[in-house]
């Protein structure tokens, strides 16, 4: 927990999801405020965890500070904002007894930002959310175009590893990537002397 706090204070961006800081490495529940060791970093504390039935969802609405809305599933964590130095809610639960509680929040900590996701959302939400977080953090995608679902791109220097995790082949910019395969793509190096 301290390493995450130090990283964020120095300008890093951290995303914390539901179930974070509930138990230790021996699977014993922490006593006291949770997420354990992260309440100051996140600007909130978890008060309760509500498990949802299969197929049940809880709608979450955007706040004035957030532009997204989504339905949470699996569970809904109920968190209260810290009295001093609270997080800024980006989405609030819109129904049930936790209506008005933060479902997604951001907290400025030192030179960085810490995000808290209190429920499980769908893939479209995560795509939009992480695109916004990466843009704010100044991160560039490993591949310039939107990739099909199930395809991962990881950049290492002038190389991009394209991984197809699908049970079917996909076409990426005219190159077929077979099912369950990896392809190495070499990018053209940028000559910094030629930039003006």
Regions found by a protein language model. Give the residues of each.
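A conserved amphipathic helix/loop scaffold
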Residues: 1-196
